A protein has these predicted regions:
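Short, small-residue-biased leader/transition segments that mark boundaries at the very start
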Residues: 1-6
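Short, well-ordered alpha-helical segments in soluble proteins
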Residues: 7-8, 23
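Outer-membrane beta-barrel translocator/channel fold
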Residues: 20-28
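Active-site regions of oxyanion-processing enzymes, predominantly non-cytosolic
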Residues: 16-18
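Outer-membrane beta-barrel pore domains
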Residues: 31-258
C-alpha cells in the first residue's frame, strides 16, 4: 500500500490533493474438490452509526485473487468554509485450477466432455467497482476551521460553533454484463437473457448501486461536547431488491470527547 498528499497552505487557506494505491493477494479460503477456493466479500452499510447492516449493498466474488485499489482525494478550506471529496476504484482479478475442477467432475452429472467445454460453461471474469463522495460545510459562527498537518485532515469544531454541511456519496457494487437477465426467484443472472438450468453461469455481479444525499447541522457547545442532526436520502439500484428503492434516515447524535 502507498499514499501521498500534496499541500499548499497560507494563513487562512489550505488546499491538498492526495492519491493512494493498495494491492492485496488473497491466499485464504475453503477447500473444495482438493482445490482452494478463495472469495472476496464486499459490502457497505447505509450512512448511519447505529445499523451496520450490509444486506442492501453487498457482493461475493468467488475465486478472487488479486485486488487493486486506487484512490484520489482533495480538500480545500478557508476560515469559515470547507469542501472535500474522494474517489475510489477497485479492480479484482480471479484465478482457479480449472484442470483439477474439471477432473473432479468427471463421471458426475456435472461432467463435461472437455476442459475447453467446461471453461466455456464456467467462465471466469474480472470485476471493477467505483465509489465517491463530495462534502461541503459552512460555519455560521465559531473559531476558524483548522487543518491537521500530521494527519492531513480537517480538525473538528473547537469551542462554541454552529455549522451546516451537505454531502453526496455514491457506492457502486454493480458490475453487470449487458444482455444478462436477473431472475428474482432464483437470485441469479442468466447469460444472454435466457432462462436455463444447465449451464447457467453468469459473469454479472449485482451488489447494488447507492446514491446518498445528506443535509446536516452541527452545534458545538465547547471542545468536549457536540450535537449533530442530519437527514439522508438514499436511492438504491439493485435487481435483488426491485421494490426497495428509497430510504430515508433521520439521525441525531450527542458526542462527548475528552
Amino acid at each position: 500500500a502507498a499514499s501521498d498528499v500534496y499541500k499548499r497552505q497560507n494563513e487562512d487557506r489550505t488546499f491538498h490533493v492526495g492519491a493512494a494505491f493498495r494491492y492485496a493477494n488473497i491466499a485464504t479460503g475453503v477447500v473444495e474438490n482438493n482445490v482452494l477456493k478463495t472469495e472476496l466479500d464486499l459490502g457497505s452499510s447505509l450512512e448511519t452509526y447505529v445499523d451496520a447492516t450490509q444486506d442492501f449493498l453487498s457482493a461475493k466474488l468467488p475465486w478472487a485473487k488479486n485486488v487493486f485499489d486506487v484512490g484520489a482525494e482533495f480538500l480545500y478550506k478557508t476560515d469559515n468554509f470547507f469542501t472535500r471529496g474522494e474517489y475510489m476504484y477497485k479492480h479484482v482479478t480471479k484465478e482457479r485450477d480449472d484442470q483439477a475442477l474439471f477432473e473432479a467432475n468427471l463421471g458426475s452429472i456435472d461432467s463435461w466432455g472437455s476442459l475447453e467445454a467446461w471453461q466455456k460453461g464456467n467462465p471466469l471474469g474480472e470485476n471493477s467497482f467505483h465509489g465517491a463522495y463530495i462534502e461541503a460545510g459552512y460555519k455560521i459562527f465559531g473559531d476558524p476551521y483548522q487543518y491537521s498537518n500530521s494527519d492531513a485532515l480537517l480538525k473538528g469544531l473547537n469551542g462554541r460553533a454552529l455549522e451546516v454541511v451537505a454531502r453526496y456519496s455514491y457506492t457502486g457494487l454493480n458490475d453487470l454484463v449487458e444482455g444478462e437477465k436477473y431472475i428474482p426467484g432464483r437470485d441469479q443472472y442468466y447469460p444472454n437473457g435466457i432462462l436455463a438450468d444447465y449451464p447457467a453461469t453468469s459473469l454479472s455481479v449485482g451488489g447494488g448501486n447507492m446514491h446518498s444525499a445528506t443535509l446536516g447541522v452541527n452545534y458545538s457547545f465547547n471542545k468536549f461536547a457536540q450535537v449533530m442532526l442530519s437527514y439522508t436520502y438514499n436511492r438504491l439500484d439493485r435487481d435483488k431488491f426491485q421494490y426497495d428503492k428509497n430510504f430515508h434516515v433521520l439521525q441525531a447524535r450527542l458526542m462527548f470527547q475528552f
